[in-house]
Amino acid sequence: MNTQCLHLNYALVEDILLAFIRNEIRKFGFRSAVFGLSGGIDSAVVCELAKRALGPENVLAVLMPYRTSSPESVNDARLMVEKTGVRSEEVEITGVVDAFFDGVSGAGNLRMGNVMARARMLYLYDISARDGRLVIGTSNKTELLLGYGTLFGDMASAVNPIGDLYKTQLWGLARHLQIPEELVSKIPSADLWEGQSDEADLGFGYGEVDLLLYMMLEKRMSRSDIIEAGIEESFYDKVRKMVVRNQYKRMMPVIAKISARTPGIDFRYARDWQEVK
């Protein structure tokens, strides 16, 4: 089995995602959207999809660099704004993040990165309240499964059109959508600190982990069958541990049940109520 099994009919995927964005925006009672545009491929795909679904005048892309952000990332984000014609704002988060850590020693890259991600989401939700725009997410399926993201940071949104697409599938969709090649081919990075890259953080490439996740989830193959197919035991065990350990990041907060009807457990109705009286 190779990564060819991950290939999708990207024209059909586009149609599904455009309808998804339009329908979900309408169900929530909104007409426009806001999202963070980093200069990476995930947010670039969301930018193009949102533009096609809602029209550029109804989409706001927010660029939120930190002082260590790569100038290339900022330029790539601006390139997407120019290409799509969506509205944009630039918010410098350095002051907020540095003030948070003022007098704090030994924070390290992980804590700094988490605060950057949450600062960005804070700005997005404030803009949502200011303008009446719905926040669209930009986390892909690989990130969500591995827990490679910040809870209530970059993983926070009202709707997420790309959350069921593996990273390698995002590249395929990006080329179908004619995203500039310099964004598609660049090394994936959350750009949280200088020299950071996704695959260096994770310790493996997206192609190999996407294939393993596909075997585990879509094909529901057993550990023994996956290893027999050529996946190393240590790699399988590492990835499975990450998926299991980060389950809490893919859930709403768990509520302790006390009463007969509990929100999220047995008090559940269709989200898109047609009338609220």
Curated annotation (Swiss-Prot):
Binding, deamido-NAD(+): 118
Keywords: ATP-binding, Ligase, Magnesium, Metal-binding, NAD, Nucleotide-binding
EC numbers for this chain: 6.3.1.5
Catalysed reactions, as listed in the record: deamido-NAD(+) + NH4(+) + ATP = AMP + diphosphate + NAD(+) + H(+)
TM region positions: none
Positions of ATP binding: 36-43, 138, 167, 189
MF terms (GO), sorted A to Z: ATP binding; glutaminase activity; metal ion binding; NAD+ synthase (glutamine-hydrolyzing) activity; NAD+ synthase activity
Superkingdom classification of source: Bacteria
InterPro entries listed in its UniProt record: NAD/GMP_synthase (IPR022310), NAD_synthase (IPR003694), NH(3)-dep_NAD(+)_synth (IPR022926), Rossmann-like_a/b/a_fold (IPR014729)
Pathway where this protein functions: Cofactor biosynthesis; NAD(+) biosynthesis; NAD(+) from deamido-NAD(+) (ammonia route): step 1/1
GO biological process, one term: NAD biosynthetic process
Any GO CC annotation of this UniProt entry: cytoplasm
Purpose: Catalyzes the ATP-dependent amidation of deamido-NAD to form NAD. Uses ammonia as a nitrogen source.
Family: Belongs to the NAD synthetase family.
Subunit structure: Homodimer.
Name used for this protein in its record: NH(3)-dependent NAD(+) synthetase
Taxonomic source organism: Chlorobium phaeobacteroides (strain BS1)
